[in-house]
Amino acid sequence: MRKHKAPPSGSPRTMAQDNSQSEPSGGNGESPAATTAAAASVEAPQQSLLLGHNAADASAAAVASRLAPPPCQHPINNSNNNSNISNNSSNSSSSKERPRPTVRFISLLHVASYVLCLCAFSFALYGNVRQTRLEQRMQRLQQLDARIVELELRLEQQQLLHWPAEQTQVLASHPSDRDSSNSNNGSQHLELHVRRELHRLRRDVSHLQLTRRQQRRQAAEAAAAAASGEGGSGGGQCQCQPGPPGPPGPPGKRGKRGKKGDSGEKGDPGLNGISGEKGAAGKPGDKGQKGDVGHPGMDVFQTVKGLKRSVTTLHGGTLGYAEIVAVKDLQEAGVNVSASTVIKLKGEPGEPGPPGPPGEAGQPGAPGERGPPGEIGAQGPQGEAGQPGVAGPPGVAGAPGTKGDKGDRGDRGLTTTIKGDEFPTGIIEGPPGPAGPPGPPGEPGARGEPGPIGPAGPPGEKGPRGKRGKRIFGPGGTKIDEDYDDPPVTLLRGPPGPPGIAGKDGRDGRDGSKGEPGEPGEPGSLGPRGLDGLPGEPGIEGPPGLPGYQGPPGEKGDRGDIGPPGLMGPPGLPGPPGYPGVKGDKGDRGDSYRKMRRRQDDGMSDAPHMPTIEYLYGPPGPPGPMGPPGHTGSQGERGLDGRKGDPGEKGHKGDQGPMGLPGPMGMRGESGPSGPSGKAGIPGAQGETGHKGERGDPGLPGTDGIPGQEGPRGEQGSRGDAGPPGKRGRKGDRGDKGEQGVPGLDAPCPLGADGLPLPGCGWRPPKEPIISTPVHKDYLPDVTQPESNTSDYEQEEEEDDEQAEDNENEYDEYQDNLHNNE
């Protein structure tokens, strides 16, 4: 008989081993289930928090899931475990195994679940506090928005209440009363400025209100969408409330260039074109009748007193510019000669007159004095050709023949300096004369009627962004229905503005239409006798012959020799005014003496309600720069001859002047080679003075004359047409800091190094207008003349700049107040 007999089901040793082997397997099978349950309990509250569920509910569900029995165990396993436990307890003495860690693992899971519950509770408490603070902030913002809307409504109501009375009062005023109400211009301008600022404030507040309403609408839509999502999906979406609106974004980039505008209207007709070229010379007319005998002439050299030596030495010689000087004193002898007629003698020669008929040869008479030109006689029949007479002394120059072909240009002539040196030169034109003193101001003209309103100018470029303005709050008004769907655009447009102030004179308007041609002028007086012609070739002395026929146009002559250098000529007659000089650099800005006087005289009369301001006159400033040339006025009537001026003081010896113009032709030189003898014409009788012919074509522009002396003061010309508006000049650079001013009148005058008071100290403003010392007594300035247009333009530009600066400062203050209130 054996000691260890195996039963049918197996030996106990084998069962114990099986049980021991099954227990680890059972323990191993239990540990993955517990790990899975713990992981599920940890992930459950996290998923509930992410989905928006309450943290407390999630933690409670997690604890319940941990306390529940594991769902993966079966009853068979429980029975097996019980049997295993009993077997283990019965066989504990026989088997040596490690203790199981199941109880310790479960206690660790409980501690972790408790920690997670505490964390979830703290997170829930923090979310509740934060949500409460956000709700309080939203309530404050809503109260502020309601306050802004209420203030805006009050301001609009006040504007609507005060507007009808002011509009009816402005519209009822007659245009004629506007001129008499110049004293109210300042108050009207202030009212217009206030209304403009109120309109700008209303526009900004309306824009702010629209933005706030849009934000409210978006918040309401988001809340409604969140509520609908929560009811439909059962808490599957986030229920977070939207946060406060963010700050406004930065300004966007500049937009693209706009499309091309519509074509403009048809422009005004252009100016008249330039005059055409001079027409061809007409055919020679018929021969005139024989004229009467002319009056005896007058010896210029015996009549005129006080001739210069250069003129008397040329008596009987070659004539030139020097003989023109002899005409200056012919007025005292009864001959009507003026500077205008003398200058006209320098023009182009007129068309040749009709030749007279040939007369019979008369007996040689005694040489008579030179008489004035006779009148042109009636045209007579053509006589027979007479016998050629004996060549007489040089007669009076005949009528100028037709203009021949232009000859070749000669070599440049020679002239001499004061020392007698010769040097080649052409027609030397002297430098332009110095600018004459400013003419006296004319009498102030009557105030013109206001000009018509000019056409609207082209749209200007987009200006820079203005500064912030002030924010003005009006009294409260009734509160309207706060409907978010109502568009606030109606608040942007205000009532129509009152009619503007009457504009100034329309000097910037368009040029008027060309006037009708004036009536033909009266025939001019008989002009002086022309200058004698050049001496002819020396011939046999004989009786003076009568003027001959006008010969046919001569052939082109040969090129002549260079003549000897001429003598220095006498000073010429006053020439026409020179061309305007080059515009100088811009001078320093003068003192505001005239501007202060203008504001004191004109500004006080326009605004009598303003307090009177007493200005302290400063010392007279330096003379300003010469202004631009004014518009050319219409030619005035010829003034009366002024009386002879007082003899001036003897001046100092001046500097040596520039080289003068070429002098007159020199004395007759040696006789050149005799040319081909021409056929002597039959001397004709002097014709009668012809009638004034029709006005000829405009001649070519003449060369610049010698700068003339200062002429007498002319009468004030009529006001010219308004010129085109000039472009507005850019603002000049800031000037340098001025010198130290004159000490005050109340303080004692400081003494200089020489012990005398400093110059300018103790100066008192004059009681009368300051008049600068004139060059001549005829050039006294007229204080009553209105100021020039340039000063008016400067005044307008300065006023515009001041107004723009005031507007920018007010807008800056308004923007600052607006941001502070927000």
UniProtKB/Swiss-Prot annotation:
Bias type Pro residues, positions: 242-251, 431-443, 567-579, 619-628
Ranges annotated as biased composition (Basic and acidic residues): 284-293, 403-412, 504-517, 583-602, 638-655
Places the protein is found: Cell membrane
Key word Metal-binding present: no
Domain spans labelled Collagen-like: 241-299, 350-409, 430-469, 493-526, 527-586, 621-680, 681-740
Biased composition (Polar residues): 11-25
Coiled coil spans: 131-162, 194-222, 790-822
Protein name in UniProt: Collagen alpha chain CG42342
Extracellular compartment spans: 126-822
Native organism: Drosophila melanogaster (Fruit fly)
Composition bias, Acidic residues: 793-815
Residue ranges of the TM segments: 105-125
Cytoplasmic side: 1-104
